[in-house]
């Protein structure tokens, strides 16, 4: 799933959620919910359901073997279902015929992806919330702290660090709202059977779908979405936007923390940010992680959009490509969110250096120009804006 280089750009939590064991466990949760729902409606014997449910425990399975065999099968679900049947047969051979009954591989895999994505989304929302709180606190504290406003990387006039902080926070607030709006539509149960009609469910497909969705805490679909990927991809697009907004914050921090600028610095701790042979340096590791995520997210999102035209009822290749692109996007989004949730609460702000940089610009300009564009009295406009925006964003 990940390389050694992916590891330090990610979080251990998200890597674990999308790990082999977690995905197999999520598919087993699908199979248990399926058997439970079908038995409750009389489609399969209760004794068979109990045998299946009791066997859907990831510790009973050789996950590494399932993953190895998936390459030959072309699907993670196929060797998983075979292994589940083999294991159920050890306890109740009559129940084997009811394992995975009436559904298809994509049902299990899409549902599993929704389950593990939900776990990581909760972490992303938590960490982005921490970042927003930190930024709004900084904005309130530094509403009146003068700062050079830079356009096209050049000093342009006076703003305040508070305005900068609300400018960082506002897109994150909007992203959280949009994520919460699109997530319920994306995090849906997948259940369509072989061609999406649930023909094997004896007319009880909608009831089974509702029971399973409630069991798993997912949204119940009105029909299968095997090749209707719009709501799923919409969630991916929102994650891409979030990563871009976090990357903008990180890029500003990197520029402001240069020795020549020295206006902010990431928090420091033993073993973090120190170079291999230059003890005088402190590298902005958290910002580096967020910038790396922002560099990679556009390609991931573009790939999700590219594979949306999926043929007929089930796709050969496009869906599989989507599966490969999805985890790295979500994982890097959480890596970025976690990094900024570390950096912003402990961000070191050097207001004296901010003032000194303004003085240096003023000294380099004719007095009339300096007084027009870099008079410290201009900060009152920024202060009012920062205070107003903090109140709006906290509302």
What are these regions (language model features)?
Residues 1-192, 198, 204-209, 220, ...:
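A helix-coil-helix interface module used to build multimeric assemblies
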Residues 15-19, 65-67, 272-289, 311-328, ...:
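Short beta-alpha connecting loops at secondary-structure transitions
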Residues 33, 37, 83, 87, ...:
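Generic, well-ordered alpha-helical scaffold segments in large soluble proteins
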Residues 105, 208, 215, 219-223, ...:
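A structural signal for small-residue-enriched, beta-sheet-centric alpha/beta enzyme cores
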Residues 118-125, 129, 136, 166-169, ...:
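Short amphipathic alpha-helical segments with heptad-repeat character
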Residues 175, 225-312:
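Glycine-rich anion/phosphate-binding loop at the beta-strand->alpha-helix junction
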Residues 218-239, 316-317, 368-373:
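Amphipathic, heptad-repeat alpha-helical segments used for oligomerization and assembly
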Residues 296-367:
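Long, amphipathic alpha-helical stalk/connector segments used for oligomerization, subunit docking
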């Amino acid at each position: 799933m990940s390389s050694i280089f992916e590891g330090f750009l990610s979080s251990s939590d998200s890597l674990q959620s999308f790990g082999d064991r977690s995905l197999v466990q999520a598919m087993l949760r699908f199979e248990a919910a399926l058997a439970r729902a079908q038995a409750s409606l009389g489609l399969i014997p209760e004794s068979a359901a109990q045998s299946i449910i009791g066997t859907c425990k990831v510790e009973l399975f050789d996950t590494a073997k399932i993953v190895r065999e998936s390459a030959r099968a072309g699907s993670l679900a196929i060797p998983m279902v075979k292994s589940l049947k083999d294991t159920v047969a050890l306890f109740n051979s009559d129940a084997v015929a009811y394992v995975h009954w009436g559904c298809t591989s994509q049902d299990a895999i899409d549902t599993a992806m929704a389950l593990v994505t939900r776990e990581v989304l909760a972490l992303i929302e938590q960490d982005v919330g921490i970042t927003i709180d930190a930024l709004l606190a900084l904005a309130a504290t530094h509403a009146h702290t003068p700062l050079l406003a830079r356009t096209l990387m050049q000093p342009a006039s006076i703003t305040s660090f508070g305005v900068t902080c609300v400018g960082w926070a506002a897109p994150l607030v909007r992203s959280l709202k949009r994520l919460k709006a699109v997530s319920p539509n994306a995090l849906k149960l997948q259940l369509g059977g072989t061609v999406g009609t649930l023909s094997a469910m004896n007319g009880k497909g909608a009831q089974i779908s509702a029971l399973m969705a409630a069991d798993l805490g997912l949204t119940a679909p009105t029909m299968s979405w095997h090749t209707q990927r719009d709501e799923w991809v919409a969630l991916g697009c929102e994650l891409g936007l979030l990563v871009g907004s976090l990357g903008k914050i990180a890029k500003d921090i990197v520029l402001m923390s240069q020795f020549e600028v020295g206006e902010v610095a990431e928090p420091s701790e033993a073993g973090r940010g120190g170079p291999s042979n230059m003890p005088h340096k402190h590298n902005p590791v958290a910002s580096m992680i967020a910038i790396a995520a922002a560099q990679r997210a556009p390609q991931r999102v573009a790939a999700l959009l590219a594979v949306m035209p999926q043929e007929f009822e089930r796709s050969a290749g496009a869906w599989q490509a989507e599966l490969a692109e999805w985890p790295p996007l979500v994982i890097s989004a959480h890596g970025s969110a976690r990094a900024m949730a570390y950096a912003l609460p402990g961000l070191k702000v050097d207001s004296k250096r901010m003032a000194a940089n303004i003085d240096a610009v003023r000294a380099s300009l004719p007095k009339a120009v300096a007084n027009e564009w870099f008079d410290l009295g201009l900060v009152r406009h920024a202060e009012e804006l920062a205070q107003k925006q903090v109140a709006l964003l906290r509302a």
